[in-house]
Amino acid sequence: MHSPKRNYDIMQISVPEAIQQMDPEETLFSHPVDTEPYNALGIGPGLGSNETTAIALIAQIRRSTCPLVIDADAINILSSHRAWMQQLPKDIILTPHPKELDRLAGTTSSCCYERLMKASELAERLQAYILLKGHYSALCLPNGHIDFNSTGNSGMATAGSGDVLTGIITALLARGY
């Protein structure tokens, strides 16, 4: 786990088994990490959105050599730096909730179908996987197909659970799924 220096003690106490890599900055993500030793990388939850972090994020995305999952603050940074979206690697996974998708697409959708079509178009244009979170989460594939998860419940689409979902997807990618 890469985290600002200030988080070291709390991380040691709450998740002692986590391997930590501390950012040189006290309170923000400022430098990309070497991803060579990793099988997957999840970026976004708790990241923050200041300009130093935004620059470090795009540098991290460019330098990453492993599969990436982008969520939360990382999605918001990409939404405010739209030109950077063209630099995303093929097959990246983006996990927006509906409002984050609206920001990514640069439009506002009032209906679910319209939003779903925007997610599908964006996935095709970026050659990315977009998991649009909701009661029935939709996975928009780079080839234009859309798969729905109609099993389970909307627990992972509930406010505050996106960080957990990012971790689960990242862990599955790291295991080779």
Question: How does the language model describe each region?
Answer:
Residues H2-T151:
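Glycine-rich phosphate/dinucleotide-binding loop and adjoining beta-alpha-beta core of small-molecule
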